[in-house]
Amino acid sequence: MGRLISVRFSLLVVFLSLSGIGAGLCCPLGWSSFDQHCYKVFEPVKNWTEAEEICMQQHKGSRLASIHGSEEEAFVSKLASKALKFTSMWIGLNNPWKDCKWEWSDNARFDYKAWKRRPYCTVMVVKPDRIFWFTRGCEKSVSFVCKFLTDPAV
């Protein structure tokens, strides 16, 4: 009997792994997983600093999202399209000293960009036919997206 239960459980684990259903199990309810990170789009509009503070309160290691490639950008844009009426949102890229030295709020490497124009804090805009980034004064209020690394031990 114990062996039958073990076999059934093993088959369930294999099924969930292959179906992708288990992929989101490391993220809290309401968050979505992509490439070992959890993401959540927040609709209430906040300025960049307030948005970053809210992200940091959500989960250990959570910050405004850093984007490192077109696949990640497409994933975040799908989340935004589902969650927001107006698909403009803060991401973690900023120029805090206004010296053209851009950095991610989570200290990730600045290795991908999709600029529309320049300086200060960065908004990602999702349109039906394109995705682009542009800079905006950090005091402006828009929606935002948070991100954190999942715990592989969970």
UniProtKB/Swiss-Prot annotation:
Record site: Key residue for binding with integrin: 88, 118, 127, 140-141
Purpose: EMS16 is a potent and selective inhibitor of alpha-2/beta-1 (ITGA2/ITGB1) integrin and acts as a potent antagonist of platelet aggregation and cell migration. Binds specifically to the I domain of the alpha-2 subunit, in a metal ion-independent fashion.
PROSITE patterns: C_TYPE_LECTIN_2
Lineage, highest ranks first: Eukaryota, Metazoa, Chordata, Craniata, Vertebrata
Quaternary state and interactors: Heterodimer of subunits A and B; disulfide-linked.
Keywords attached to this entry: Disulfide bond, Glycoprotein, Hemostasis impairing toxin, Platelet aggregation inhibiting toxin, Secreted, Signal, Toxin
Entry GO MF terms: toxin activity
Residue span(s) of domain C-type lectin: 34-147
GO cellular component: extracellular region
Subcellular location: Secreted
Positions glycosylated per UniProt: 47
Pfam families tied to this protein: Lectin_C
Signal peptide: 1-26
SUPFAM superfamilies: C-type lectin-like
Protein name: Snaclec EMS16 subunit beta
Tissues where this protein is expressed: Expressed by the venom gland.
Paired cysteines (S-S): 27-38, 55-146, 121-138
Family: Belongs to the snaclec family.
